[in-house]
């Protein structure tokens, strides 16, 4: 994968230079160069921070969860360790199918901020169900994982198309770099937090030479991230109404 990515980078660089040369030959103005004041504009934009916070909170409740999901299936739902990765594996498979569908839905009907709110509510529901000591059966875990797949597809399909409506096009590349920087802090810190919580507060007895864990507290933490994501999504909808970003408007105008 790294080799393919490296090849893609060189191809992109080649065609980007070719495009610049073509624009020069046609006498068209090149893109505006990067300026430090662009960063200042972006980080003083409240809409940017709301999207960035929603991004880091939402993904922090999904990707780190996937890291521990297989063990959760074994510890709580008594799934065979050889099959434990199958249920969490439904998440990315579902996202491949659902994300384009939800993206098309957003293009046609709009309601981007509303879709992000709905996805955040679904995220809270999923992690609350995983935290509660009810129905510790594999098929229940499968249903909950499918619902998480819907949320995992719904929020990004509305969040990423909404981003260019908040940030001017000439600053969009810088804004994407900043939002991924913020996101990666969360993706770095949350697994460390969950691992520390498990080792400090959630250890159970050793069974057949293997350490057991109670995942109630980690799932409650993930649910808390969902609650915070919901609050931010509601704030984003209010900011959209105030600033007129057009997040609730369809991208395809009839």
What is each model feature region?
Residues 169-203:
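A late C-terminal transmembrane helix in Major Facilitator Superfamily
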Residues 45-96, 156, 160, 190-191:
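Extracytoplasmic gate region of multi-pass secondary transporters
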Residues 112-159:
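C-terminal transmembrane helical hairpin of 12-TM major facilitator-type secondary transporters
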Residues 79-88, 137, 141, 214-215:
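Juxtamembrane helix-start elements in MFS-like secondary transporters
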Residues 98-111, 198:
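Helix-to-loop junctions at the C-terminal end of transmembrane segments
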